[in-house]
């Protein structure tokens, strides 16, 4: 089902009244063809002719969008499954994901074709027919064997006492494990050299399924190999090794593609590649650790705190993007530096006008940190009222989030220098019970405008537009560039975070709860937020000597006991002090002497707590045995997540 309709259509309405509207859904492919030169040398009539090409979305465009939507849907399925009330159900996550990748009527591998088409258009390269054919044949063969395994797993669950069912199932499992190894070799740098980036999302999906299959060996292994005590352990070691191998492969090739765009100075392409590979590769591999059924034997409430950025509105206009200024300048103008996780609370906008053109000339975000009632104001970007104009505010109601939006900006008509700034924004806001629209409007109806929609703002399955009770991302920040080409030309980008993030840091009653430490409510001392490596699902907190942070939590159920566990890495011996607070005083304390992990993440088992209050704080402080000065310039304690494991 194609859910974008003709929102990609450019409609020119009633030229006699000089009122026109253009619709601009993106990402616009291919990446390797920036349109600055085209726009600078195209007159109005020619530009309208260019727009005619986007009148109806063709099958290729539909396939490309479906490939992106599949990545969105699979991540949401994983998050939803692990957060469900029963994890060892009769279907299983392996079955659910395989059904998404191989729908019942998909005999032509259309889903996998969509995934390949998406990456082809993303990086403007093509997979040869030979390479594509090899991959499709391998996937078709794998489909039959996956279906066979799923069928025998169901038969065994329906009749677990049947030794015949069990024997056949174990044989199917062993063969399928080998088949996955073969499929990986078909799409990796050995089987398809030179096509590693083009096949990377395919590789990630195959790797994901393989690890879920190996997870089955941990869930059912004590019954499958009751007479072979070491079989389950052997497959566990294989799962650990494959998790490392698959993660490193995806990160290495993702970074290579990213660096190719960075080296070429193509920030627009760099940002789009980063966003869409996050949605189709990095989000998936960030789930791999929770497939470890020994570390995570029950349901897991998990979150993705990474931030993605839209294409830049007006990014094709000269003066607002590279090569007019440096790659680093573009990154600072249109994205945020690493930061504690924030919740958008509203905006202050400044509206100005030049002649008959009225537009958004500057703005400021209002936000808060998790479980922190203080409202912070971001830096003002663009032109404030010092340049004239009026100020207005938009406030997002408490416990509400922007799940969709669209914008309108004045159309660029070469060679005139009229403003191309935003004139209208429509924010769709949800409290998860209903929706309301908050509108910024400076629009004059007698001027031609371009409408921009954000195609990655879908429902959780990635198959339809976002709805107030079913959405994948929420707006977290707006960035305005009003400094590189004067008041008539502004560039705008929007930041979004995943809808899995819990605004209250709620500790589930009967699930393992993972909460990224970047969701601290406050930090102090020599502490910084570091860009995540790509496989953690978000940024990390780096603590130096004599630094500390506070995290506030909400207990779903009182009088529950939990083991507290921290995922961290450290290249130097340090001391971590954890305290649980009640009011102004702490009621529990645990001091840990931490040894170096030499670059790898490890788990620290801390104290056991009881949820005696609905809301409580935990603090973390770091000291070093040789003092601040000695370790000031070396890597420090890096924290990823804090976890709460029900003791029962």
Swiss-Prot record:
InterPro entries: Galactose-bd-like_sf, Pest_crys, Pest_crys_dom-III, Pest_crys_dom_I, Pest_crys_N_sf, Pest_cryst_cen_dom_sf, Pest_cryst_dom_II. GO terms for molecular function: signaling receptor binding; toxin activity. PANTHER family: ENDOTOXIN_N DOMAIN-CONTAINING PROTEIN-RELATED, PESTICIDAL CRYSTAL PROTEIN N-TERMINAL DOMAIN-CONTAINING PROTEIN. Toxic segment of the protein is located in the N-terminus. Belongs to the delta endotoxin family. Promotes colloidosmotic lysis by binding to the midgut epithelial cells of mosquitos. This is Pesticidal crystal protein Cry19Aa. It comes from Bacillus thuringiensis subsp. jegathesan.
